[in-house]
């Protein structure tokens, strides 16, 4: 679902920021 993708995307965003 879009909700799940949002959370996954957030996690990737933080990882990429690192």
Curated annotation (Swiss-Prot):
The keyword Transport applies. Keywords: Olfaction, Sensory transduction, Transport. Antenna. Disulfide bonds: none annotated. The keyword Transport applies. GO terms for biological process: sensory perception of smell. It comes from the Eukaryota. Present in the aqueous fluid surrounding olfactory sensory dendrites and are thought to aid in the capture and transport of hydrophobic odorants into and through this fluid. Belongs to the PBP/GOBP family. Homodimer. This is General odorant-binding protein.
